[in-house]
């Protein structure tokens, strides 16, 4: 039996805690930064698929064809809180990047398995409870990862560059856009110019290690 464990990292201007996994995944500005794939039979070999829009920051270790072969031929697709992975796979990997959908009977959710036996659903807490050997929370890596997941307010110099006469307008338009985007909507104005994404090659490589 071929079993793989999958873990997505994504970025989006919408807040998943407010709009939920499916509206988050459906939003046109949500994108996959990377996907970690692990073969259960070879747990020390974690391979990274880097999203097409982020390969200028780090080369992908798994090609699109290799990833398609791995997922299409697996018997179990394992993820913690699998509805998120399923939503990202369906709305981004399939509809945007051309991968094949994963049959529901192949999906295994380890968070559900934790609930079934009375363990915490939170991955870190469940690992602590089980005294999982080798599991150590990488706090620095987690901090770096959080820099990439959402846009930040443009710095004053960039706000002035976007609108030399009224840089405060850029700030107010950014805040207006973020207010709408966070609930999964799309503003009725061209908001992309007001979003400032964090893209640092060194930190992205650190996130891959995380």
Indicate residue ranges for each PLM-predicted region.
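Entry/capping segment at the start of metal-dependent catalytic domains
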Residues: 1-31
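Short beta-strand scaffold segments in enzyme catalytic cores
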Residues: 33-38
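Active-site-proximal helix-loop-helix substrate-binding element of RNase H-like nuclease domains
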Residues: 41-64, 70, 75-210
């Amino acid at each position: 039996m071929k079993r793989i464990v999958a873990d997505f990292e994504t970025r989006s201007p919408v807040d998943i805690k407010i709009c939920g996994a499916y509206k988050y995944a459906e939003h046109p500005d949500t994108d996959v930064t990377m996907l970690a794939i692990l073969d259960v039979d070879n747990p020390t070999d974690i391979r990274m698929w880097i999203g097409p829009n982020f390969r200028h920051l780090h080369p992908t270790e798994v090609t699109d064809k290799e990833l398609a072969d791995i997922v299409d031929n697996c018997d179990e697709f394992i993820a913690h809180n699998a509805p998120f992975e399923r939503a990202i796979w369906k709305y981004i990997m399939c509809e945007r990047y051309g991968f094949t959908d994963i049959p529901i009977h192949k999906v295994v959710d380890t968070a559900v398995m934790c609930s079934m036996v009375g363990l915490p659903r939170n991955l870190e807490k469940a690992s602590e409870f089980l005294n999982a050997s080798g599991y150590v929370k990488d706090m620095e890596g987690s901090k770096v990862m959080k820099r990439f997941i959402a846009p930040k307010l443009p710095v004053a110099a960039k706000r002035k560059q976007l609108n030399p006469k009224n840089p405060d307008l850029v700030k107010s338009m950014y805040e207006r856009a973020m207010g709408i985007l966070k609930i999964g909507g799309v503003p009725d104005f061209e908001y992309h110019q007001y979003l400032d994404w964090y893209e640092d090659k060194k930190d992205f490589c650190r996130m891959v290690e995380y």
